[in-house]
């Protein structure tokens, strides 16, 4: 009975068939905007710090996203402050280490890893990265990690580390470059700008 209450009230006030105006949202980025801004960043401003509140806000998206069989088995470690330097030692070599992210989220699984956990992992990482972009931050998703060293660093034997979301404020510009040739999609840097080749829609749709 209450489902269409607002619609009925609208018609009572403005008349049946009156055009309904969509609410105007100021300052809310569209999905396309977030996707375009959500680029892999490898060089970060070292004086721009990520707050604990920002990290919690990023992880909070996982309370709203899909999970295979609704198992919700992923767990998250928020890394900032004194724990950043030792984790950097594990994740990066010089010279990349000194310009790397200033905060991290380590993603774990609380149950044995399987293909559905890996699907959940992809959904989670992309969702958190877009939330970070919404907050004015940038990310690098790092899946090539030494799981044993990370386990030992945080003395956590109960959970298996799967990937790390590296977070900070970009110190480089990254742009998408539409291409037609799929033979070489290697990103490159030119005149201080990092370009990422991307195939066009017609190149990825199967007709």
State where each predicted segment sits:
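Acidic, surface-exposed loops and disordered segments
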Residues: 1-207
């Amino acid at each position: 009975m209450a489902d269409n209450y607002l619609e009925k009230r609208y018609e009572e006030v403005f008349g049946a068939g009156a055009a309904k105006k969509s609410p105007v949202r100021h300052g809310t980025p569209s999905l396309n905007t977030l996707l375009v801004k959500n680029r892999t960043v490898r060089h970060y401003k070292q004086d721009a710090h990520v707050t604990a509140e920002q990290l919690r806000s990023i992880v909070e998206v996982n309370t709203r996203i899909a999970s295979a069989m609704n198992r919700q088995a992923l767990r998250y470690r928020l890394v900032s402050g004194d724990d950043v330097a030792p984790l950097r030692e594990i994740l990066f070599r010089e010279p990349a280490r000194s310009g790397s992210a200033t905060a991290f989220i380590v993603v774990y699984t609380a149950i044995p890893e399987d293909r559905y956990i890996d699907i959940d992992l992809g959904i989670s990482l992309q969702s958190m990265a877009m939330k970070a972009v919404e907050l004015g931050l940038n990310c690098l998703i790092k899946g090539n990690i030494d799981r044993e060293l990370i386990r030992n660093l945080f003395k956590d034997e109960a959970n298996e580390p799967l990937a790390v979301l590296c977070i900070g404020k970009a110190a480089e510009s990254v742009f998408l470059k539409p291409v037609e040739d799929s033979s070489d999609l290697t990103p490159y840097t030119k005149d201080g700008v990092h370009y990422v080749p991307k195939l066009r829609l017609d190149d990825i749709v199967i007709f």
